[in-house]
UniProtKB/Swiss-Prot annotation:
Name by which UniProt lists this protein: Ferric uptake regulation protein
Gene Ontology CC terms: cytosol; protein-DNA complex
Location(s) in or outside the cell: Cytoplasm
GO term, biological process aspect, one: regulation of DNA-templated transcription
Gene3D superfamilies in the cross-refs: 3.30.1490.190, Winged helix-like DNA-binding domain superfamily/Winged helix DNA-binding domain (1.10.10.10)
Gene: fur
Provenance organism: Neisseria meningitidis serogroup B (strain ATCC BAA-335 / MC58)
Residues reported to bind Zn(2+): H35, E83, H92, C95, C98, E103
Positions of region (Dimerization): 87-144
Similarity comment: family membership: Belongs to the Fur family.
Length: 144
């Protein structure tokens, strides 16, 4: 995404445009297929020569989550990871050996969740599905 669009996105979210916010948003745009922790963000920005405090990163990530720019997840590692909220629903399969995260969408699972909710008198407003297993690479390496 272009910097102009990032500025507009921050303003549309009611956030003041600041250097740290732009850097962090740009980082998530360039790593759009990854799930990044606050520590990952800090490490990547340091490698790029950007001086920013860890507390600032945590604060910006929280603000972005509240503004609907990022989604937060808690996978097997126990630490929060973030990804851009692209507006599309998807679920996750996480490798318990190497931490690889695979996103997927399955209409059959979605329909079954709706059916279960309806049978129990609920209407789903949100959900998160995390499946844990061993990826094919780790299986091949014998990390069962």
């Amino acid at each position: 995404m272009e910097k102009f669009n990032n500025i507009a996105q921050l303003k549309d979210s009611g956030l003041k445009v600041t250097g740290p916010r732009l850097k962090i948003l740009d980082l998530f745009e360039t790593h759009a297929e990854e799930h990044l922790s606050a520590e990952d963000v800090y490490r990547i920005l340091l490698e790029e020569g950007v001086e920013i405090g860890v507390a600032t990163i945590y604060r910006v990530l929280t603000q972005f989550e509240q503004a609907g720019i990022l989604q937060r997840h808690h996978f097997e590692t126990g630490k929060a990871v973030y990804e851009l909220d692209k507006g599309d629903h998807h679920d996750h399969i996480v490798c318990v050996k190497c931490g690889e995260v695979t996103e997927f969408h399955n209409p059959e699972i979605e329909a079954l969740q709706d059916k279960i909710a309806e049978e129990n008198g609920y209407r789903i407003v949100d959900h998160a599905l995390y499946m844990y297993g061993v990826c094919s690479d780790c299986q091949a390496k014998g990390k069962r």
